[in-house]
Amino acid sequence: MIQMQTNLDVADNSGARRVMCIKVLGGSKRKYASVGDIIVVSVKDAIPRGRVKKGDVMKAVVVRTAKDIRRADGSVIRFDGNAAVLVDNKKEPIGTRIFGPVPRELRARNHMKIISLAPEVL
């Protein structure tokens, strides 16, 4: 459950380390984002020679949340922290690698490129 002002780790090699959610996309009154949702983020911490700089405003896909995700079979999956992958306007990842596991729910949201780059799909 990601809302405005939430800090997230970046799970790709785009150059950003930490980002902060500044808007949840998908409706004027929408308050929360979950796995697979697109948010607008501000880069708060970045490595020196990365593709993005501190202060850049980007779009990102939420790939991990500390709030548990309920599945149709009754099982629950949750992660240790919140993480996102930076994407461009065509919803393609900016980085070329994804770090850490990602949930299967991204497939239903048509984020196939993120699924294919991820080392582990839970």
Swiss-Prot record:
Signal peptide: none annotated. SUPFAM superfamilies: Ribosomal protein L14. One of its GO terms (molecular function) is large ribosomal subunit rRNA binding. One of its GO terms (cellular component) is cytosolic large ribosomal subunit. InterPro entries: Ribosomal_uL14 (IPR000218), Ribosomal_uL14_bac-type (IPR005745), Ribosomal_uL14_CS (IPR019972), Ribosomal_uL14_sf (IPR036853). The keyword Heme does not apply. It comes from the Bacteria. The keyword Metal-binding does not apply. One of its GO terms (biological process) is translation. Keywords: Ribonucleoprotein, Ribosomal protein, RNA-binding, rRNA-binding. Pfam families: Ribosomal_L14 (PF00238). Part of the 50S ribosomal subunit. Forms a cluster with proteins L3 and L19. In the 70S ribosome, L14 and L19 interact and together make contacts with the 16S rRNA in bridges B5 and B8. Belongs to the universal ribosomal protein uL14 family. Binds to 23S rRNA. Forms part of two intersubunit bridges in the 70S ribosome. PANTHER family: 50S/60S RIBOSOMAL PROTEIN L14/L23, LARGE RIBOSOMAL SUBUNIT PROTEIN UL14M. This is Large ribosomal subunit protein uL14. The gene is rplN.
